[in-house]
Amino acid sequence: QVRAHQPINTDGSINLEAWLDHAVSVDLALDREALKEACEFARASEQQANAAKNLWSEGTSSFRTGLEIAEILADLKLDQDSLVAAVLYRGVREGQIELPAVSQRFGPVVAKLIDGVLRMAAISASLSPRQSLVLGTQGQVENLRKMLVAMVDDVRVALIKLAERTCAIRAVKTADDEKRNRVAREVFDIYAPLAHRLGIGHIKWELEDLSFRYLEPDQYKQIAKLLHERRLDRERFIADVMNQLKVELQAT
């Protein structure tokens, strides 16, 4: 699991300079100043909009989420335009930033990436709430996945959306039940399989793990308990073998 690296100042704000240092250390090909410009623009836009700091749950915001999305993409070694688009995406989605302004300031490629992610979000939003893990028939869910893949002419769009949904499923832990389950169902049915198709195993596993935890908490706890017991059994077995080896080595 890729965890957010967001250094905090004493007043609770993001230490942007430290964050940029970390981002560039992950990928030396990144343009620090261009990324800084995008971050400052996103932060200023959020402040001007007087946006609530609770995007998915207490303490989240479009700016902080943009940084977390960018971190995930930096770990995947995506390019500069992708990270700039990631930083700005939630601001555009929340109406804090206009897409033409993005195109004018950061270029048409960044604007096109954000527009593609917005279109993906619009299609996946057609996923209706349901009581079970499967919406309608499995065929309907599969058709929706295929539609998302078909509409994406740049794989970077899908990767940005995957990173954004990863941030969402992490953040809804403290959200209300309706919001948490809605995000989890979308992630489980649409985005975890998409991560699998794109060969991003660590994101697939995190999406599946967190969404299943929220959708089927009793089964999740049961499985976690079994895995814990097996881990303890393995540890005891290894300890026994090590002790036996020590005895045999001392006897020689």
Regions found by a protein language model. Name each.
Residues 1-252:
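Active-site helical microenvironments for divalent-metal-assisted chemistry
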